[in-house]
Amino acid sequence: MIFGTGIDIVDITRFERFLEERNTRLFERLFTIHEQEYCAGKAHSAQHYALRFAAKEAFLKACGLGLREGLTWHDVEVVNDSLGKPDLRLYGKAQQLFADMNLSKTFVSLSHDGNFAVAMVVLERV
């Protein structure tokens, strides 16, 4: 059964600007080291950062919480399987809330066009 859905859209040019400004503190606050390494290794890294940020926001919306209840940006990590399919890896408070809400699965869709990155997250309950 579907528990919640969340969607978020991000302007990629914001992340292009953050990269140009070399705003490393922002990236360290928003993204895990694995996400930073993944994005930095891509030709269009701003696009990949924007997609990951949108997915984190979409997850928070799907939970109906926002960034509160002790959650941090590092509690939600966007990962890809061997075929490139995106998914979420949860840590800390996000993992605890996921279990407390009896959630069983996340579904993630990422897309981009022009200057925009969009993510949708669906949460399933057992």
UniProtKB/Swiss-Prot annotation:
**Name of the protein in question:** Holo-[acyl-carrier-protein] synthase
Q: What does this protein do?
A: Transfers the 4'-phosphopantetheine moiety from coenzyme A to a Ser of acyl-carrier-protein.
Q: State the superkingdom.
A: Bacteria
Q: Could you say which enzyme class this protein belongs to?
A: transferase
A Pfam family that the UniProt record links to this protein: ACPS
Q: What is its EC number?
A: 2.7.8.7
**What keywords would UniProt list here?**
Cytoplasm, Fatty acid biosynthesis, Fatty acid metabolism, Lipid biosynthesis, Lipid metabolism, Magnesium, Metal-binding, Transferase
